[in-house]
């Protein structure tokens, strides 16, 4: 396996060096007798920066779905009142509806 890898690397390096040598040998050097052309204008492209979002606390990011937690909590009752609310409820019996005199 190592031999195959070594052969592949050697072949790739050999091809790239041969291609580089061929490229440099065939490119003629520019002659100095040509007149200089005006340099091309370079255009500078400015990047458009987006406004940074407002920073939030980490807890606000995690719990943004719990909007119900901000509502007013119900009144707290004593523990005994919670347990015995049904036993000691003083409900008055329903009065019959007053009948109009006919």
Swiss-Prot record:
Primary subcellular site in the record, as a coarse category: periplasm
Keywords for this protein: Periplasm, Signal
Entry PTM: Proteolytic processing gives rise to the active protein.
Cellular component, GO, one term: periplasmic space
Any Pfam family: Asr
Coiled coil: none
Propeptide: 22-58
InterPro entries: Acid_shock
UniProt biased composition (Low complexity): 22-41, 91-102
Signal peptide positions on this chain: 1-21
Cellular localisation: Periplasm
Spans annotated as Disordered: 22-102
Biased composition (Basic residues): 80-90
Annotated NCBIfam families: acid_shock_Asr
Function according to Swiss-Prot or TrEMBL: Required for growth and/or survival at acidic conditions.
Family per similarity comment: Belongs to the Asr family.
Full protein name: Acid shock protein
